[in-house]
Amino acid sequence: LNLIRRLFSMITVINLTLLIIYKIFKIQILKDVISSMSMIIFLMVFPFWLTGDIFQAYDEMLDSFNIELQNTYLKYVLCFIVDFCIHVIPFILMGFPQNNTSIIIALFIIDIWYFIIYQNVSDIYTPFVNSKLHYSVIFVHICMLFLFIVNSLLFV
């Protein structure tokens, strides 16, 4: 039961759900909000990859699910493949958002997730990821502000 609650509170499961919903909606603004959310989720994971913290996150994740692999190389390759499928492929399939309004709406939705769901269900991720996630949220806000400014300047 705890595992199911953790999984459904994770933003990664939300990202995979968005990929399914994306194909259903015909209204472009909804599709654009969904693609914006997928991009934001990708950007939330990016600092972990950039700093190399992802390896410690992988170790703690496997430990939390009681999965033991003796081969370190195999362990990291399998984790990276799963991580790539969950965070990168949805972003690639949905593409970049087309307007600033959808970016703002998506950022607002992600903020609601962060401040309401994540803050109330504190054991969603491993302790290491929990200690670093607020930096990812700040990073996403900076990236979205930059993207918003660039979009505004390019499409005046």
Name the predicted role of every residue range.
Residues L1-Q28, I34:
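Early transmembrane hairpin module of multi-pass membrane proteins
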Residues N2-L7, K75-D83, N130:
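Interfacial loop-to-helix transition and helix-capping segments at the boundaries
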Residues L3-R6, Q119-V156:
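Membrane-interface transmembrane-helix boundary segments in multi-pass integral membrane proteins
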Residues F25-M39, F96-L107:
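Interfacial segments of alpha-helical transmembrane regions
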Residues I27, D32-M61:
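Transmembrane alpha-helix/helix-exit interface in multi-pass inner-membrane proteins
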Residues M39-F48, L107-N120:
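Aromatic-anchored segments of alpha-helical transmembrane domains
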Residues P47-S102:
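Membrane-proximal helix-loop-helix units in multi-pass membrane proteins
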Residues H87-I105, F115-N120, I149, L153:
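Alpha-helical transmembrane segments in multipass membrane proteins, preferentially the mid-helix core
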